[in-house]
């Protein structure tokens, strides 16, 4: 048995996991390969579940926290994992079987469909905020309507700062004002494509459809956690840039 791998690819919007299986003793031929493949799928689903549990929702919570606290989320997440598809498979020379399985982060069959409604239900009501749709690059990219200036989106350049992707990040200014967060989003859009998009560079963020033709590009001052966490999933911009976004 080999060590299996699993990973969340935020830029691609997928979660993948590798699984290995061996046939039971005394089985041969096609029956052995079928049983080895079945075992590999079970192993991949188990690794996928572990990876999904560790996905950061915000600075202080992971998917696992929601699964533990909500039977509805647990049931939805379990169904999504079982619905993952085999995207790569291979019979090994020793008779073992290897598969790679993938599930989407977004869309009606994606992890967001289980998590975003739970985020909404756990978000206290607030006065109607400015409508913002953004893109962050890890750089963060968001689609934001900004004060009639004509910007089609916002790109926050947080490259080299150790930004950790999450489902529900917040953009703050240096005065601690929340510029963008769950209060600003359209939940259907967040399920279909995420609150923000993550890219490896500003140039790749500018190519994202959500950024539009004329995005506002601002440089993050730093990354930060939440009130009770140091997980660097949120970005901080200057007060002036915060005003430009709003």
Briefly describe each language-model feature range.
Residues 1-246:
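Domain-level marker for long, solvent-exposed, non-transmembrane regions
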């Amino acid at each position: 048995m080999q060590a299996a791998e699993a990973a969340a690819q935020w830029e691609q919007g997928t979660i993948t996991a590798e699984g290995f299986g061996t046939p039971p003793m005394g089985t041969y031929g096609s029956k052995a390969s079928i049983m080895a493949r079945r075992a590999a799928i079970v192993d991949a689903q188990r690794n996928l579940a572990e990876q999904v549990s560790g996905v950061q929702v915000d600075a202080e919570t992971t998917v696992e926290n929601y699964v533990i606290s909500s039977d509805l989320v647990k049931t939805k997440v379990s169904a999504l994992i079982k619905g993952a598809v085999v995207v790569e498979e291979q019979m090994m020379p020793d008779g073992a079987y290897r598969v790679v399985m993938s599930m989407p982060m977004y869309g009606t069959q994606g992890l967001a469909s289980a998590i975003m409604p739970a985020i909404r239900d756990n978000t206290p009501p607030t006065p109607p905020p400015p409508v913002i749709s953004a893109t962050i690059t890890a750089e963060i990219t968001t689609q934001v309507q900004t004060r009639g200036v004509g910007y089609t989106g916002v790109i926050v350049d947080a490259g080299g700062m150790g930004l950790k992707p999450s489902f529900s990040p917040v953009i703050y200014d240096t005065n601690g004002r929340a510029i963008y967060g769950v209060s600003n989003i359209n939940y259907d859009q967040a399920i279909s494509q995420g609150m923000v998009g993550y890219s490896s560079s500003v140039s790749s963020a500018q190519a994202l459809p959500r950024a539009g033709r004329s995005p506002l590009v601002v440089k993050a001052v730093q990354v930060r956690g939440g009130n009770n966490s140091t997980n660097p999933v949120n970005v901080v911009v200057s007060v002036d840039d915060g005003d430009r976004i709003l």
